[in-house]
Amino acid sequence: SVGFKAGVKEYKLTYYTPTYETKDTDILAAFRVTPQPGVPPEEAGAAVAXESSTGTWTTVWTDGLTSLDRYKGRCYHIEPVAGEENQFIAYVAYPLDLFEEGSVTNMFTSIVGNVFGFKALRALRLEDLRIPVAYVKTFQGPPHXIQVERDKLNKYGRPLLXCTIKPKLGLSAKNYGRAVYECPRGXXDFTKDDENVNSQPFMRWRDRFLFCAEAXYEAQTETGEIKGHYLNATAGTNEEMMKRAVFARELGVPIVMHDYLTGGFTANTSLAHYCRDNGLLLHIHRAMHAVIDRQKNHGIHFRVLAKALRMSGGDHIHSGTVVGKLEGERDITLGFVDLLRDGFIEKDRSRGIYFTQDWVXLPGVLPVASGGIHVXHMPALTEIFGDDSVLQFGGGTLGHPWXXRPGAVANRVALEACVQARNEGRDLAXEGNEIIREASKWSPELAAACEVWKEIKFEFEAMDTL
């Protein structure tokens, strides 16, 4: 360089490097970029790399005090999105030194910070991130994960069953505890605080924790199975959240819960560390995710939020149902379900996986299917999610005509029937209805459930396409 030259340079001169060979230690990002009219794709891709790493809008003399070659993000490849006009996937490589170790917060502040408000872009969406092994190893990750959770609960060879307590707001603590007792008494493994339930005037958290712990212990004694209620520790401050987690540990319950997006990654990671140190499982709810991930051309895809949660820490996370009332495309959903559960995931664009991801020793997270599902969906859910999942029926348990306990019985009978049929080699996709019908001959509870929900399906066009 011939010395400092003031003025505005094109981003692509510095930040578009198509010949760059990515390093194993780089964090790689795939952005869906929609440039403003007249902005060439290379310039838009380079602008993203610049604004999310070392660059700014003009040359500054302090650039000479650092080594841009060492620290700059680079846009190393651009491809047009099939079927979309003026939309591109820009691949950006970030040197690992740009990020603080063990901080999802810092990673997101850089990669999805100011750049999303950038004027030269009409819209920007982060589709996927490749987290290098060197960075993965700086995170604790899930407090316990799939195998340890099964060992703690002594439940193997089938998905776990849960029930969200409804009505979500307005019950007193004692009545809430009664509802909590009925579900595991019938046969569900878990009950769940709704994500909106924190500590409101009609039910303060401490009262709820006490009644729920009592309910679960009672059900545990009567059924001989380990039961848990996800006690929601989400709060307005970190200190208050930790106070709730500590009280849960003092009660000896197996699991607490957190809303990781509204609570924030910093709070979530603190809670995950506490949970590992104190033997608590951590259930994660994703309230607010659709604000971030539902638009096709702007925001962050849920697979990135799922990866971030695995790094920050959680043992369960809600991840759509493919069949219920909320959104989720089958292949794409299964793509991020594998990213949550498996140790090594191959690049596969047909499932929306842009990079091969190696999680090395980071434990896996159980995906939770929840939202508008009922017994008639059980064969499909067992088929799609397999054993390592939590199937959560709120209305599908509490809405049973004979109430909550028979509702839980119906779900458990349906689940056991599907698992048995699968283990016998039957095809759940083709024979699902038949399997449920056969089982309902032996279970009046299941027969009553089938009667109520025989034909309800929530079918709309999927919005998330590749």
Curated annotation (Swiss-Prot):
One of the Pfam families matching this protein, by short name: RuBisCO_large
GO-annotated molecular function: magnesium ion binding; monooxygenase activity; ribulose-bisphosphate carboxylase activity
Entry GO terms, CC: chloroplast
Residue ranges the record marks as coiled coil: none
Cofactor note: Binds 1 Mg(2+) ion per subunit.
Keyword Plastid (UniProt): yes
Chief subcellular location: plastid
Positions carrying N6,N6,N6-trimethyllysine: K5
Keywords: Calvin cycle, Carbon dioxide fixation, Chloroplast, Lyase, Magnesium, Metal-binding, Methylation, Monooxygenase, Oxidoreductase, Photorespiration, Photosynthesis, Plastid
Catalytic activity: 2 (2R)-3-phosphoglycerate + 2 H(+) = D-ribulose 1,5-bisphosphate + CO2 + H2O; D-ribulose 1,5-bisphosphate + O2 = 2-phosphoglycolate + (2R)-3-phosphoglycerate + 2 H(+)
Positions annotated to bind Mg(2+): K192, D194, E195
Anything else known: The basic functional RuBisCO is composed of a large chain homodimer in a 'head-to-tail' conformation. In form I RuBisCO this homodimer is arranged in a barrel-like tetramer with the small subunits forming a tetrameric 'cap' on each end of the 'barrel'.
Record-stated family: Belongs to the RuBisCO large chain family. Type I subfamily.
Protein name as annotated: Ribulose bisphosphate carboxylase large chain
Originating organism: Cornus kousa (Kousa dogwood)
